[in-house]
Amino acid sequence: MRRNAAATAADPFRMTARASPTDPTDDAAYRLFERRFGAVRRARQLEPVLTFAVVALLFVLAAVWTDFLPATVWHGLPRIGEYFGKLLSIQPRRDADPVPVLAWAHLFGGVKQPQSLAYWFYRIDVYLRLLWQTIQMAILSTAIGFSLAVALCFPATRTLMATPPVVFVVRRLLEVMRSIPQVVLAFILVWPYGIGPLAGILAIALHTTGSLGKLFVELNENADMRAVDGIRSVGGSWLAQIRYGVVPQVWPGFLSYGLLRFEINVRSSTIIGFVGAGGIGQELKRVISFNIYEEVSAIVILILLIVVTIDLLSAQLRHRFLGTPS
């Protein structure tokens, strides 16, 4: 007994050979813990199953309401390449067939020769001028939207702006700008500014401001605040905290998002032309409405070429100036 007492005194955590009697209160608490832990574990296991079931149900309902049915999609797959197959077919075009045809025998004929490239692109000067206008619209709208997003993103950042009402108002403003589709904005702005590129530039610029502003706010909130705290501790103004504490960290991300948005705006400048907002899209709508399928095909080919070219150039710029893979 004395030896065990001495050992226990030397090591109070040492278990003695004799087991302590079981406490009924401890057993009840343990069983209660097991029940609650099991309930929590079952709830966590059930949560992803319920989430998947709800998402699947919503997907099925949306597919039924929009006629997005597997049978319909599968039936149309073989016809995806039909247009391009007829486009380059050597067979003569039937009057009832709306698909324009490029015939190899007349491919390099004159502007009066049907089924030739010159016949398709006889208005190439007009198309190139409108494409250049479309690119200018994208450049101007991106520059305006980028500048406004940079100016508004800092007051909308909770970690940088100490006045909650200002943060709330600026964030709601950015949400309104990006929530309205560009086509709707262009349609609204065509009324006061008339048909032309001005309405398209303003519509894309407003949407760009809202979209880039949200991304810039997220970059600001993830910035390291130690530099900002240091500038604040020595009496630096709010603008000095932004200029020297935040901008050096987030500026590469700003440029990357700006270049990506420029690629998107080139495509958007084409689409909003359908509501009279200028650019090549307005001409595309005209030739579609008159069923001039040769010109439709020519414009679509030019749009594809210019979009792919700009995407490649933008990727090279990101790789060169920001060090990101192209």
What is each PLM-predicted segment?
Residues 1-143, 155, 159, 322-326:
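N-terminal, non-cleaved signal-anchor transmembrane helix
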Residues 120, 124, 128, 132, ...:
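Alpha-helical membrane-protein architecture signal
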Residues 128-136, 170-177, 259, 263, ...:
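Alpha-helical membrane-interface segments at transmembrane helix boundaries
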Residues 133, 137, 273, 282, ...:
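Pore-lining and gate-forming transmembrane alpha-helices of multi-pass membrane transport proteins
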Residues 138, 142-150, 154, 158, ...:
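Hydrophobic positions within alpha-helical transmembrane segments of bacterial inner-membrane proteins
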Residues 191, 195-246, 252-261, 312-315:
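Membrane-cytosol interface at the C-terminal ends of specific transmembrane alpha-helices
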Residues 297-326:
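C-terminal transmembrane helix and the adjacent membrane-cytosol boundary/short C-terminal tail
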